[in-house]
């Protein structure tokens, strides 16, 4: 309704972090929206080129939405170092997965959601705040902390948890951007927590700094295959060839 081309969060936990309210345009949902539009536009173009299906009107629609949303994403959320978690709540945290959409776009060979400079600056802030300054990097990347690595709410849930699947995705993003040592450090921390805790046959979604875990057998941990994709440029997994 506000003509910025980006989805608004309603102030309730209305996205995958379902105990973490966002208000207005958010970095997490906005970046995913832009990446989704890029994918939809590419699909429409491919369908027309490969099958002759007329998709000109869809391409025009997706393209206009994309132009509108792109022009407002940085304007509303970029703070000079990383992207604000959202445009209206004023929550002063570095959200670890704020550029999930940019990772997906780059992984799929689409137009990146943000500039390389902004991507690298954001990843640096995420590494320092949510990994290096959270338990010394021994657990993995926490979902969201203040820039100095302290919690906004010491009794918070989702912001203070390490989500295995989110971590594998973030590690893949670091690797995609040429920062393999950081990717390896994040993965090693998470895998060590899972295996040293005897959780390898019930991989949990969330691990905490007080030795608790929840949401076992969660499928988001399959994001670990993103590391294979970024490391091999989508080579087939050995033995997975189809006759």
Question: What are the residue ranges of the model-derived segments?
Answer:
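Short clusters of hydrophobic/aromatic residues that line enzyme substrate/ligand-binding pockets
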Residues: 7, 82-83, 139-142
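Hydrophobic, small-residue-rich alpha-helical packing segments that form membrane-like cores
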Residues: 2-46, 58-76
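Detector for glycine-centered tight turns/loop "hinges" at secondary-structure junctions
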Residues: 3-6, 80-82, 149, 198
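Short, ordered beta-strand-loop transition motifs
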Residues: 1, 79, 131-135
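Short, surface-exposed recognition loops and adjoining beta-strand edges that mediate ligand/DNA contacts
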Residues: 67, 72-98
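Active-site core of glycosidic bond-cleaving carbohydrate-active enzymes
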Residues: 20, 31, 35-45, 49-53, ...
